Amino acid sequence: MNAALKRRQARLKRQVRVRRKLRGTPEMPRLCVFRSAKHIYAQIIEDVTGKTLVSASTVNSDVVEGLENTGNVEAAKAVGKAIAQKALGMDIKNVVFDRNGFLYHGRVKTLAEAAREAGLSF
């Protein structure tokens, strides 16, 4: 088994372990983050109905404006601000942060800090 496959399997184990305990309610939906090599995605999900309330990513053209690269820390900061602004527009202030098995470091940490600075609390 190569190193990349081991890392992916370890992330999926962390994801399952955390998802058992973490649920988004109508009062406090779940802010879920996914990161790939080229993009970063964030969505706010209410787990009771299984619906995505708000989403933002570096694939969206409104977030990418003025960015040279979509897979770096600056892009994660832009996505964090965008998701917070959209959430506050829907009167969502409190969320539960789901790092989706990724380590709280780098782009995931930057997205979370940018969302907090823009007004979300978790």
Swiss-Prot record:
Domain of life: Bacteria
Entries under InterPro entries matching the protein: Ribosomal_uL18_bac-type, Ribosomal_uL18_bac/euk
An annotated GO BP: translation
Cysteine disulfide partners in this protein: none
Keyword entries, A-Z: Ribonucleoprotein, Ribosomal protein, RNA-binding, rRNA-binding
CDD domains (alphabetical): Ribosomal_L18_L5e
GO molecular function: 5S rRNA binding; structural constituent of ribosome
Function field: This is one of the proteins that bind and probably mediate the attachment of the 5S RNA into the large ribosomal subunit, where it forms part of the central protuberance.
Family to which the UniProt record says this protein belongs: Belongs to the universal ribosomal protein uL18 family.
Record's subunit section: Part of the 50S ribosomal subunit; part of the 5S rRNA/L5/L18/L25 subcomplex. Contacts the 5S and 23S rRNAs.
Protein name (database record): Large ribosomal subunit protein uL18
Protein species of origin: Syntrophotalea carbinolica (strain DSM 2380 / NBRC 103641 / GraBd1) (Pelobacter carbinolicus)
Gene: rplR
